[in-house]
Amino acid sequence: MATASPAADGGRGRPWEGGLVSWPPAPPLTLPWTWMGPSWGQHPGHWGFPALTEPSASPAAGLGIFEVRRVLDASGCSMLAPLQTGAARFSSYLLSRARKVLGSHLFSPCGVPEFCSISTRKLAAHGFGASMAAMVSFPPQRYHYFLVLDFEATCDKPQIHPQEIIEFPILKLNGRTMEIESTFHMYVQPVVHPQLTPFCTELTGIIQAMVDGQPSLQQVLERVDEWMAKEGLLDPNVKSIFVTCGDWDLKVMLPGQCQYLGLPVADYFKQWINLKKAYSFAMGCWPKNGLLDMNKGLSLQHIGRPHSGIDDCKNIANIMKTLAYRGFIFKQTSKPF
């Protein structure tokens, strides 16, 4: 655990020249402060801001990274302090502007999300531009992109066999911003049980007209591959992984139907993150009711219709963004085939 004095830089406030110091320089204190969460991925409570830039500043002068960390003062009181880190110098003009704008919110007893929200609004309102308005950042993830997937399949009570995929949605989620960058969404014509049951329509909201005349699974898989290539996801230098709500989609449904139809399963479908497991690691409890429990546990509103594949993907993406915002690092949960 590292310690730093608010006056460690002689009150000049230049963190690029000597470790981490408070920004702006705090009044001199005789007792040191203890910084909690020295690096991302090791300690929760480490929050960051992406590079801040201004159109009027040169790249060399306008780059910088801000972090928000919870600290304890000598009396044991907890507070938040933003820091500037990184090798690049931050324009003194921009730094002074940001200091004036944030003012009393620099040391605030509020929680990290509230602090970030206040800071974002104040900085954006004073003309810091789009990058500043979206300055809340996330811990570095292991993947450049997350591919959120949630199948809907033919079903009935009692269950029919084999089940067939009838909705095939994928959201391309940027691993740095946790924002959706692209969407793949197709309905699939079932061939073994071409007529949807009333139970299936009631559960998924998919009616017969939505699947009649649609491409077969083989054709949809070919289009998925084309979409993956177009999005740069097949580049060996780009790390991506699928994310599902459970193991059923990629451990049972897709390989089972492909085996039945004699179709190969692409390698990129053979590793994934089970969001239920990720959530349980992050929150310490298992979401028995899947997305409903995860949304409730994170105080999120459910998006769209339950058991709509594309809406379920949006909920998964929203849950991932919230967990990432809290500092969670997503890791592969599936075992190699």
Swiss-Prot record:
One of its GO terms (molecular function) is RNA binding. It is an enzyme of class 3 (hydrolase). InterPro entries: 3-5_Exoribonuclease, ERI-1_3'hExo-like, Exonuclease_RNaseT/DNA_pol3, RNaseH-like_sf, RNaseH_sf. Mg(2+) 1 binds at D150, E152, D312. Keywords: Exonuclease, Hydrolase, Magnesium, Metal-binding, Nuclease. AMP binds at E152, H307. Binds 2 magnesium ions per subunit. Mg(2+) 2 binds at D150, D249. Residues 146-320 form the Exonuclease domain. The active site is at E152 (proton acceptor), H307 (proton acceptor). Its EC number is 3.1.-.-. Its cofactor is Mg(2+). Pfam families: RNase_T. Interacts with PRNP. PANTHER family: 3'-5' EXONUCLEASE ERI1-RELATED, 3'-5' EXORIBONUCLEASE 1-RELATED. This is ERI1 exoribonuclease 3.
